[in-house]
């Protein structure tokens, strides 16, 4: 839709260099908007200077030079891609962002679907049909500059947004409010300025620059003393958790741990034509019954279609060299994108059926061999989550045993009373654990390290 840009100037004496960097950001931001661009600068005394034009800044760069001076404090800017629903044939300056109110200046990326309703509810008048133009008069009339009050106003907006807001009465600060629309922040210590824009690529930052992605569903206030205040737009507390459960040690301990912490959990199990499908299914059913929690099963042929893994029936032999140590140290039984697919399905179910979070048995031990067991996989998926769910339906991603190795998981499981005796860890689907695959090796060693007898039986 658009790219939003903002700058909070800490060292006004560097205004010429800051101006050059701003222009470069706006030129790169044409990636998200080529129909018009605008820049409004708030001076120390609250007065403003502005430039607005149709088309691209790269073809009209000369209009931007000289917009800053030694008294400039806050810059609010926009590169607009005009959506079909807001096409204006004969545009005037009033149709070009940023929009200016008596006190507040606003640049907006997104769509406000209920702009007409907001206009009536707050009894305000805007000067253009553009949806974003309804925001400054509402803020002028109802917002006192405190982010807690801004939250109440933003909760009335139906749609998507990333706002960057300047305050003429307090030109020593800048505000950023967003749901799932992205905003990045970069502090340029050398220039003495804090830059904000829609994608980090627009900064052209070096490896040593401080670049931060601001959290979705948050409001951030930054002042020129380098103080940051932040609140969350959503007050949702985590109560219901959907746990991806294989029937093995890790997910069983993870589920039990969450249950003991007071969460309402449901187990989610996938049957995907893997060698141990029947044994895992039997195990997870008994575990759900033991913990007295619901179980959701999903049967899928997807991995049979993908193939290229020995973990599936008919897929080849499981590696059992060195009594299983070889399988514990390398991902011989890798299943392409399995955890990503499991997590994506879990996320969809969580959103659809009102779960607050998803979790699994991903752990530090298996991260040594499997990329999708790495803690970073979970962290990155958690960051993806707000962009994969509907507006205001944020689903958290938890990893209860993500920082534990196998013997620590066994120790925790014993301490919290997890039904370890019901679990199935083996890659094979025999009557007993084979004792020679990677998971069997790790399981046996984990119990041995803890000085405990493993409650399951092995063939050897």
UniProtKB/Swiss-Prot annotation:
Coiled coil: none annotated. CDD domains: Gn_AT_II, QueC-like. Residues 2-225 form the Glutamine amidotransferase type-2 domain. Pathway: Purine metabolism; 7-cyano-7-deazaguanine biosynthesis. Its EC number is 6.3.4.20. The active site is at 2 (for gatase activity). Its cofactor is Zn(2+). SUPFAM superfamilies: Adenine nucleotide alpha hydrolases-like (SSF52402), N-terminal nucleophile aminohydrolases (Ntn hydrolases) (SSF56235). It is an enzyme of class 6 (ligase). Binds 1 zinc ion per subunit. ATP binds at residues 245-255. The keyword Ligase applies. GO terms for molecular function: ATP binding; ligase activity, forming carbon-nitrogen bonds; zinc ion binding. NCBIfam families: 7-cyano-7-deazaguanine synthase QueC. Belongs to the QueC family. This is 7-cyano-7-deazaguanine synthase 2.
């Amino acid at each position: 839709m658009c790219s939003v840009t903002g700058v909070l100037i800490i060292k006004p004496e560097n205004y010429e260099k800051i101006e050059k960097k701003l222009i470069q950001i706006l030129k790169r931001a044409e990636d998200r908007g080529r129909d018009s661009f605008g820049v409004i600068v708030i001076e120390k005394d609250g007065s403003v200077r502005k430039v607005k034009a149709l088309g691209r800044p790269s073809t009209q760069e000369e209009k931007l030079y000289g917009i800053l001076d030694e008294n400039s404090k806050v810059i609010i800017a926009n590169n607009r891609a005009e959506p079909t629903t807001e096409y204006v044939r004969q545009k005037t300056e009033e149709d070009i962002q940023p929009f200016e109110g008596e006190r507040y200046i606003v640049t907006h990326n997104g769509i406000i679907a209920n702009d007409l309703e907001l206009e009536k509810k707050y009894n305000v008048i805007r000067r253009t049909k553009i949806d974003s133009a309804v925001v400054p008069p509402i803020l002028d009339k109802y917002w006192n500059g405190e982010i807690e009050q801004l939250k109440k106003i933003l909760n009335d907006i139906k749609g998507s947004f990333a706002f960057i807001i300047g305050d003429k009465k307090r030109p020593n600060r800048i505000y950023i409010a967003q749901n799932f629309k992205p905003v990045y922040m970069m502090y340029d210590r050398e220039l003495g300025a804090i830059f904000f824009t829609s994608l980090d690529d627009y900064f052209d930052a070096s490896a040593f620059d401080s670049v931060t992605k601001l959290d979705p569903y948050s409001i951030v206030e930054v002042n020129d003393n380098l103080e940051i205040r932040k609140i969350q737009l959503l007050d949702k507390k985590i109560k219901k958790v959907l746990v991806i459960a294989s029937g093995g040690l890790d997910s069983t301990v993870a589920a039990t741990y969450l249950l003991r912490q007071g969460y309402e959990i449901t187990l989610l199990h996938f049957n995907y034509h893997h060698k141990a499908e029947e044994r895992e299914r039997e195990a997870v059913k008994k575990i759900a019954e033991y913990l007295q929690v619901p179980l959701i099963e999903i049967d899928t042929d997807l991995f049979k279609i993908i193939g290229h893994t020995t973990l599936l029936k008919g897929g080849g032999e499981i590696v059992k060299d060195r009594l299983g140590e070889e399988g514990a140290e390398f991902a011989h039984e890798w299943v392409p994108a399995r955890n990503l697919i499991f997590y994506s399905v879990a996320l969809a179910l969580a959103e659809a059926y009102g779960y607050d979070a998803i979790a699994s048995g991903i752990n530090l031990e298996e991260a040594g061999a499997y990329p999708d067991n790495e803690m970073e996989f979970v962290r990155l998926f958690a960051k993806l989550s707000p962009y994969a769910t509907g507006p205001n339906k944020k689903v958290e991603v938890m990893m209860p045993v993500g920082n534990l190795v196998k013997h620590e998981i066994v120790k925790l499981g014993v301490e919290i009373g997890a039904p370890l005796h019901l679990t199935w860890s083996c890659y094979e689907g025999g009557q007993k654990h084979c004792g020679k695959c990677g998971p069997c090796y790790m399981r046996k060693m984990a119990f041995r390290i803890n000085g405990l007898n493993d409650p399951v039986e092995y063939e050897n």
